[in-house]
Amino acid sequence: MNTSDQTFELAPDLRISRVVTGLWQVADLERDGNLINQDEAALAMKQYFDAGLTTFDMADHYGSAEDISGIFHKKYALGKAQLLTKWVPTPGTVKREQVRTAVQRALTRLQSEQIDLMQFHAWNYADPSWLDCLFWLQELKTEGLIKCLGLTNFDTAHLRIVLQSGIQVVTNQVCYSLLDHRASNKMAELCLHHNVKLLAFGTVAGGFLTEKWLDKPEPHLTNSLTWSQMKYKRFIDAAGGWQAFQQLLKALDLVAKKNNSSMANVASRYMLEQPAVGGVIIGARLGKSEHIKENQSLLSFSLDEESKNVIRTAIDKLTPIPGDCGDEYRKPPFLTASGDLSHHVETLPPPYPSYEGSDGRTKALSGTLWEDLAGFSRAVKKGNRILVSGTTATHGPKAIGGDDPAAQAHFVMDKIEGAIQSLGGTLDDVVRTRIFIRNIEDWEPIARAHGERFKDIQPANTMVKAELIGEEYLVEMEAEAIIKE
């Protein structure tokens, strides 16, 4: 096995192991409030490192994973391991100094002067503070505190917004497995076009894609399962249920025997060979359950076309997981351990401030300069109607989305959704949209973006070519919503 099979270049100064050791189960091990022994856990990380599995993935909320990694880094692998972490801010307004504080906290925990890869998660795209966070993270990257930026659980539309707005990201970490192929189409295509790599987690589905569950009765969703098992049991249910899942396991078993491998390794190897995938993340329960030799062997074989066809045939019989990457954290069905967001966030605050106006109306303001100068609101609620002003891809002094009409359109619809949320409605309440475009040749990507966001809502709509104010803007949109009394 040569080195190129084992590692992958995310950026000129960052090469990772193609099998990344995930540490999110540290949080599960500590869920009863009992911290694991950090020195022993750091020593367990060293065993992976010594075996050539030098890359570890964690987050600010994975229990004491960052602290453990810092001990490991200082004692055993200074400058030789790749420590990938995440920042998942609490929903709501974020200030510049909070971003620096979060990065400094990660550096302190990791006992490092530079974060190899800082991955960012956004809870609510309708709240534009997520863009502020990324622009400020990019400033800290320029400053040298961060080597590379990545995303986690971003969908295709918002990855497009990020890339077209000049934010330099090299990865998007998403759930991507035999059960969940949401990343295989538009996401993979966009990543290939922009040289962004997917880091695939969930490839063994919390251990369900193994011999242990072949021909076994269906487990119940109870606290006797690990958090990981609770999460991926929900994916199994969404993909067609236990009987359909058993057919997938039988296909995996067939391919595993042919390749003299384990079912888990076949499942992960299949994902590793998908377009745009830079690495697969396989979880470790440090000090409890290590699979070092098996993870090493994942890099020692490849699947022939016959094996892939057997797996594809089994996948095609499953029910596709709905939506795009990361939707499980933003809209029903919430495919999380708890089945909701209770383990993650308490509430999603309104994206924009609202104020009581005259004659019983309420207005929402997005903070753009012209709202004050021209005397208008982003949206006004009167009775059960919400009227949203003509909205462009403006955020502070920036035009978001560059020269990509679809990226601009998606950000415009984010702002519209944020204004409606701030006045007590949802995008489902929209009954009318009007779209004004600068260039007639942009009509189709803008219409398709509208179709993605309003696919099941289908409001009345008009699209016309217009002379927009501001040469940088390709699309302007307004909306009307009627909310339930």
What residues fall within each predicted segment?
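N-terminal binding-site loop/beta-alpha segment at the start of enzyme catalytic domains
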Residues: 1-81, 350-353, 357, 374, ...
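Terminal-tail/helix-coil boundary detector
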Residues: 2-6, 194, 217, 221-247, ...
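Structural preference for beta-strand elements that scaffold enzyme active sites
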Residues: 9, 16-20, 54-55, 61, ...
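Aromatic-lined glycan-binding groove of carbohydrate-active enzymes
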Residues: 14, 183-227, 262, 349
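Conserved, mostly hydrophobic/aromatic
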Residues: 21, 56, 69, 83, ...
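Glycine/proline-rich, positively charged
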Residues: 29, 46, 93-182, 197
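Short, well-ordered amphipathic alpha-helical segments that serve as non-catalytic structural scaffolds
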Residues: 44, 97-107, 252, 407-421
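N-terminal presequence-like segments and the immediate start of the first folded domain
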Residues: 206, 222, 335-414, 418-428, ...
